[in-house]
């Protein structure tokens, strides 16, 4: 787009206020998520790339939806209740909210604090979640477990135990080309309870099985926590983990899941959004900085616009847009601010008298304020 002298700030901010003004007085719909480590939020210390798919959900919904993720590492349907976690969630549920329920990985464990049996105690816990959610006017949705990356037959015991190991710690079993199930009847309980109680059921095991099987034993490692030694401070010795997801895996699976949700719950589906990249300071996106997202845009993508959602926060960055990065849209959440102190007292920081074209200089540097905004398009070329 052309940026004219003395007008860009006014035009941009005016447009953004119009977009965001409709959000102010509308009540949020909250999606509460309960489950285990494959769904949960993760600490970011040391560059930890592990993510639960539920952690990535905010980047797939409009700002009408608030995601409150209570899924926690190591929890089963039983321990989630006995530790008081469920009471904390259900006390906050209001009419029209959703509760996404996914357990199974740890219900399979043998220790008495977590173990439940499919068909009896596991099903009873799921029924409790459903009944108590409905009693508060909420809408329960049942999910079964995501697939473990198990290309070994018979199933390898270490995989079934969700083992995490460092590379070379022990010899791995030879993998084949067929993905084998490790969950057994624990996959059926959510399906059966959903049918019995008239609840929406999302078959996440099938969604993830099809994804992982389609990628194969080698490419599917890109979804999971396979970390080379010496690459990430959080795991100096590396990591080999066939259960837990990395950033790419969690974003990919969350995207497939929201599409399945939209297909079964149109009322929620109207809030679903897909972006090529999400930038978020809290780890709920692909990147922490806007510059990283711009760098990831494919070069000379002329016929397709690349969309980048910038989630709430203040991003102090000097944005450099190479001439090869064209047709980019930055979409800022309400409260997203992109700024750089180096430019604060300089004129022409919005590129006045500049039209960004393919043949322009190699880079263009912009300071962009997205306060109270929700849409910004940066376009190079036509």
Predicted regions and their residues:
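Bacterial N-terminal signal peptides that target proteins for export
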Residues: 1-10
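Alpha-helical cap/lid subdomain in secreted, periplasmic
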Residues: 2-3, 26, 85-247, 251, ...
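Bacterial Sec-dependent signal peptides at the C-terminal "C-region" and cleavage site
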Residues: 7-8, 16-28
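Serine-esterase "nucleophile elbow" of acetyl-processing enzymes
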Residues: 23-71, 87-99
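Short, solvent-exposed loop/turn elements at domain surfaces
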Residues: 39-44, 77-79, 286-288
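Acidic Gly/Asp/Thr-rich repetitive segments characteristic of extracellular carbohydrate-active
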Residues: 277-309
